[in-house]
């Protein structure tokens, strides 16, 4: 706040960041790096905060490309001092778990593995499979990820047969239970036939299945069955017996087991070259393989032990204590092994040991995991080569000097002008970079229900997307120099998103509208732009009347097609979301002058929107709180004319007076 005190000159963003670097203490703790929009980019820990944070900004040549990209976006640094490095590690894991910073995702998931979600925050939690790991509440839990989605579906199907669970997201009937309750598949949560506490108790047993604690659950159910039998409650004992039999069927589907069946452990190994590492994590519970996770990681300048350590830090910061096994087997010694053991022990509240095994049985297990990692590394490298060939082919097709690294795709979605939105999707090195996706609501008053104009909408999005760059150019800044520096926050005030190529979903018309908007911004000579028409997959360039000569199956066109399809998917999903939200609101709330109270009064007086729509101006004006002017506005809303479409009567009266004058 000192910068804003009267008489003190305001500091520029680079000066504030440089001053912040000088203020960081030489103590253990955590640091949070934020961008110009106050988003947390990265959370880290260190035994000495000052030296660690400053190392990011001294010489970037020693940093990996991923971290260099991150430092260019940093506009603010926060720090939290702790008493020890172990305390800093625990705090770091909590911060990462809560904020999910993009650059803390050291690992790239090989696939979009599915999770099992239990919404513990609800009175009657739901249980379902999802590929989106988004926490709606800190109480909700995700179990997984699971490599075999087929096995996960079968397991969930059997679980719902063994345990009576909520079957539907919403009740089928408002006043009675459905067939699932009658056949014992559901405990009747919609009519509260079971208390919330009892339902949570059932679901805690289900969670044990997905935590790899089937043996523990089996012992618990056997104890319950004997207690019911001792009390001569044979019906309840029979129900638990059936659950035990179903649990046996669940655990029989494991495909791999080890001789030491009493041990639960995670096994980590990797295969790497100078740039890329493939990491495999096998989850063994009671000697059985219950899960396998495969990732690729940035390996530039990192030792194998350090890569495994970062995998451990990030993976176990995302899981519950019950999912931390008592033992970890790792392929290489870890730089801070004792510190990690202390952190995991504190998280699990029981002893956790990390071993780098030498004895044959455990070493053979490490070798098995490493072989899987080698296959994944080969597959990842082949994928990278394919992506590189695609961008090279695209550069040749469009006559670009270099293969485009950052490509942006845009699309418009609406229904006859209503709920008009646009999408911006970004591919980096040929792959979707979803953290850079953006959504736009079309703001032009000319585009509304019954009045659509895709050209105008696309031009509007270009103006909004590139206006910061246009201002920078108008201020005399060299855009080429800004792009070369990658938008370093220390020198360019946070500009860091210049695309190597912009692709528009559409033909010559949409492309012409975009180029006209870029001419207004004086950026038409700075940006590479093309469009992809839907029908024949034709590629157009600005100023060209004919499409480029290309084949629909060539790599560059296929890359544009994937980008176009992703932009279309993202735009349509946002449009559906906006339309759904609008439809949830009463149509009356769109009428100027009608607040929440008047809407309630109108509905109370007329009993339905249909009755309001059929009412005359005179009838409307007699409703409580509605005068002649507002009655006319309501009537005009439901009975638009070409001249009066959607305009309030007060505005119409002003226009008529002006015209008569």
UniProtKB/Swiss-Prot annotation:
GO terms for biological process, alphabetical: nucleotide-excision repair; SOS response
Origin: domain of life: Bacteria
UniProt main location, coarse: cytoplasm
Keywords, ordered alphabetically: Cytoplasm, DNA damage, DNA excision, DNA repair, Excision nuclease, SOS response
A GO molecular function held by the record: excinuclease ABC activity
Pfam families: GIY-YIG (PF01541), HHH_5 (PF14520), UVR (PF02151), UvrC_RNaseH (PF22920), UvrC_RNaseH_dom (PF08459)
Residue span(s) of domain UVR: 215-250
Record's subcellular location: Cytoplasm
CDD domains to which the protein is assigned, alphabetical: GIY-YIG_UvrC_Cho
Location of the GIY-YIG domain: 26-105
GO cellular component: cytoplasm; excinuclease repair complex
Self-association and partners: Interacts with UvrB in an incision complex.
Family the entry assigns: Belongs to the UvrC family.
NCBIfam families according to UniProt: PRK00558.1-5, uvrC
HAMAP family: UvrC (MF_00203)
Function: The UvrABC repair system catalyzes the recognition and processing of DNA lesions. UvrC both incises the 5' and 3' sides of the lesion. The N-terminal half is responsible for the 3' incision and the C-terminal half is responsible for the 5' incision.
UniProt-recorded name of the protein: UvrABC system protein C
Taxonomic path: Bacteria, Bacillati, Cyanobacteriota, Cyanophyceae, Synechococcales
């Amino acid at each position: 706040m000192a910068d804003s005190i009267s008489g003190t000159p305001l500091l520029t963003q680079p000066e504030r960041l440089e001053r912040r670097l000088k203020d960081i203490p030489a103590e253990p703790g955590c640091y949070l790096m934020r961008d110009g929009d106050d988003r947390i980019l990265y959370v880290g820990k260190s035994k000495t905060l000052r030296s660690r944070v400053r190392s990011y900004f001294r010489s970037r040549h020693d940093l990996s490309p991923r971290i260099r990209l991150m430092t260019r976006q940093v506009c603010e640094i926060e720090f939290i001092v702790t008493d020890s490095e172990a305390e800093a590690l625990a705090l770091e894991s909590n911060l990462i778990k809560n904020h999910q910073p993009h650059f803390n995702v050291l690992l790239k998931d090989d696939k979009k593995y599915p999770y099992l979600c239990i919404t513990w925050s609800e009175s009657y939690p739901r249980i379902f499979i999802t590929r989106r790991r988004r926490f709606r509440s800190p109480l909700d839990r995700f179990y997984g990820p699971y490599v075999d989605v087929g096995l996960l579906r079968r397991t969930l199907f059997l679980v719902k047969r063994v345990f009576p669970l909520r079957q539907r997201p919403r009740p089928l009937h408002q006043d009675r239970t459905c067939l699932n309750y009658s056949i014992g598949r559901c405990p009747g949560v919609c009519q509260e036939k079971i208390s919330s506490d009892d339902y949570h108790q059932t679901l805690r047993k289900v969670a044990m299945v997905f935590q790899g604690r089937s043996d523990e659950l089996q012992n618990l159910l056997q104890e319950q069955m004997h207690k019911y039998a001792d009390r001569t409650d044979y019906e309840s004992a029979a129900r638990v017996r059936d659950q035990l039999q179903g649990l046996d069927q669940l655990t029989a589907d494991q495909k791999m087991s080890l001789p030491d069946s009493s041990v639960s452990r995670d096994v980590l190994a990797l295969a790497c070259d100078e740039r890329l590492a493939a990491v495999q994590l096998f989850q063994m519970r009671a000697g059985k393989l219950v899960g396998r996770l495969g990732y690729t990681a940035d390996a530039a300048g990192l030792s194998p032990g350090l890569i495994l350590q970062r995998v451990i830090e990030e993976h176990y910061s995302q899981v519950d204590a019950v999912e931390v096994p008592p033992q970890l087997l790792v392929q290489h010694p870890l730089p801070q092994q004792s510190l990690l053991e202390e952190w995991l022990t504190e998280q699990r509240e029981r002893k956790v040991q990390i071993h780098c095994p030498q004895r044959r049985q455990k070493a053979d297990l490490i070798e098995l995991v490493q072989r899987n990692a080698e296959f994944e590394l080969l597959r990842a490298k082949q994928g990278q080569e394919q992506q590189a060939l695609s961008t090279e082919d695209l550069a040749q097709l469009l006559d670009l000097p270099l293969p485009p690294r950052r490509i942006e795709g845009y699309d418009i979605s609406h229904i006859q002008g209503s709920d008009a939105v646009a999408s911006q999707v970004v591919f980096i090195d040929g792959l979707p970079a979803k953290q850079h996706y953006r959504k736009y609501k079309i703001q032009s008053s000319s585009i509304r229900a019954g009045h659509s104009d895709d050209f105008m909408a696309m031009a509007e999005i270009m103006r909004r997307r590139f206006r910061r760059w246009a201002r920078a150019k108008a201020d005399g800044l060299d855009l080429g120099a800004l792009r070369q520096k990658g938008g370093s926050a220390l020198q360019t005030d946070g500009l860091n998103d210049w695309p190597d190529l912009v692709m528009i979903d559409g033909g010559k018309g949409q492309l012409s509208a975009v180029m006209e908007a870029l001419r207004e911004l004086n950026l038409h000579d700075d940006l590479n732009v093309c469009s992809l028409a839907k029908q024949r997959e034709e590629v157009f360039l600005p100023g060209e009347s004919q499409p480029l000569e290309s084949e629909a199956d060539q790599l560059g066109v296929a890359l544009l097609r994937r980008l176009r399809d992703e932009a279309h998917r993202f735009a349509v999903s946002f449009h559906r979301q906006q339309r759904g939200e609008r439809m949830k609101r009463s149509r009356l709330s769109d009428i100027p002058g009608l607040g929440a109270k008047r809407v309630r009064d109108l509905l109370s007086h007329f009993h339905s929107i249909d009755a309001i729509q059929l009412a005359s101006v005179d009838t409307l004006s007699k409703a409580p709180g509605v005068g002649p002017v507002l009655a006319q506005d309501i009537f005009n809303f439901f009975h638009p004319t070409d001249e009066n479409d959607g305009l309030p009567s007060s505005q119409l009266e002003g226009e008529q007076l002006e015209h008569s004058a």
